[in-house]
Swiss-Prot record:
Stored SUPFAM superfamilies: Acyl-CoA N-acyltransferases (Nat)
Catalytic activity field: N-terminal L-glutamyl-[protein] + L-leucyl-tRNA(Leu) = N-terminal L-leucyl-L-glutamyl-[protein] + tRNA(Leu) + H(+); N-terminal L-aspartyl-[protein] + L-leucyl-tRNA(Leu) = N-terminal L-leucyl-L-aspartyl-[protein] + tRNA(Leu) + H(+)
KW Cell membrane (keyword) present: no
PANTHER family xref list: ARGININE-TRNA-PROTEIN TRANSFERASE 1 (PTHR21367), ARGINYL-TRNA--PROTEIN TRANSFERASE 1 (PTHR21367:SF1)
Any one Gene Ontology BP term: ubiquitin-dependent protein catabolic process via the N-end rule pathway
Its EC number(s): 2.3.2.29
Organism: Pseudomonas entomophila (strain L48)
InterPro entries: Acyl_CoA_acyltransferase, Asp_Glu_LeuTrfase, N-end_Aminoacyl_Trfase, N-end_Aminoacyl_Trfase_C, N-end_Aminoacyl_Trfase_N
Taxonomic lineage from the root: Bacteria, Pseudomonadati, Pseudomonadota, Gammaproteobacteria, Pseudomonadales
Protein's recorded name: Aspartate/glutamate leucyltransferase
Protein family per UniProt: Belongs to the R-transferase family. Bpt subfamily.
Amino acid sequence: MTELARLKFYATQPHSCSYLPDEQATTLFLDPSQPMDVHVYADLSEMGFRRSGDHLYRPHCQNCNACVPARIPAVRFIPNRQQRRILKRNADLTVSAVRPVFKEEYFDLYRRYIEQRHADGDMYPPSRDQFSTFLVRDLPFCWFYEFRLEGRLMAVAVCDLLPNGLSAVYTFYEPDEERRSLGRYAILWQITEALRQNLDAVYLGYWIKNCKKMNYKTQYRPIELLINQRWVTLN
């Protein structure tokens, strides 16, 4: 483990929770003056931290522990029947790893995805500045994985390639292609990619039991949840 004791962290004031409307949230951030070192990031991911833009953070709420870090142990994952169908349905897609840059093609897909799938969320309305600040960061471990069908952009999975796994930062996809289940396929592809690169896990962020938008995460089994500072397997 990196010597984390030397790092500084800052907690926000309580603010409205993005996931549970009746709750107040507090967020713990790594000191933004700390360089974004991939090994520090990997160690913090083991402790439940995530990246958003240039910041590493985790929930630090006094009266709530509903946000549970989740990861998929890649080597032990076995797709179920529905997931095998999703893999087969999207076998015609090609995937390319590219550096994170702003393109109107990306933003147009992101905009339509947010407008049609997350118009009730805190990322609505989408803007170019928001998209760039959130996803287009010049970090050596960050990659855009493009999913294309005969040249047409269908999805982009934004991932961080860490020594201990792939961290799934965000995925946006063609909202009119509901039958393909592109969001689920992107996770399945990332599990396969983690195996190909001999990585331990795919980090999915936070699972919240009472948030319907998070329910999909526990459909990947086995999954590991960080409970009382220990990763616990849910089969």
